[in-house]
Amino acid sequence: MIPNFLIPFFRTNHAGETGAVFIYKGILKLSKDKDIISFSKRHLITEADHLRTIERLLPKKYHSKLINLWKVMGFITGYIPSLMGKNFIYATIFAVESFVERHYQEQIKILSDKKEYKELTCLLYTS
């Protein structure tokens, strides 16, 4: 279970992981590049797993209320770079993942001295 003080973070995590799933769906909808397709399929599986984990931990009443918006925005974030090619796709993924890493590091820092949340901290390290 997620402590109350982390619920706002995990609501954001829920939105972000949903967006990530749809980024890869957007890429896969358009890209014909076999390396990009392989890369995107692998990452889609990983992001879908992260999303399932967050949905399991975060009570449904705290899930993002704008979930459909995050799906559309994620899809667009993957689809548009696909119009411009492999380098744009990788640059987009790098930018998104850099932001996510900073977001999760903020949560890890908050939890780092709280031994009772060690499992949650480990989860954030692997997301």
Each language-model region and where it sits:
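Terminal targeting/low-complexity segments that flank the catalytic cores of oxidoreductases
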Residues: 1-12, 32-35, 58-61, 114
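Alpha-helical bundle segments that constitute or directly flank the non-heme di-iron/ferroxidase center
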Residues: 4-31, 79, 83, 87-110
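Residue-level recognition of alpha-helical structural elements
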Residues: 6, 36, 62-66, 86-89, ...
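Inter-helical turn/loop segments and adjacent helix faces that build the functional surface
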Residues: 30-38, 106-121
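Conserved alpha-helical segments that form or flank metal/cofactor-binding pockets of metalloenzymes
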Residues: 37-71
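Short hydrophobic helices that act as membrane-entry/anchoring signals
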Residues: 67, 71-78, 82
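Conserved small/polar residues in nucleotide/adenosyl-binding loops
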Residues: 125-126
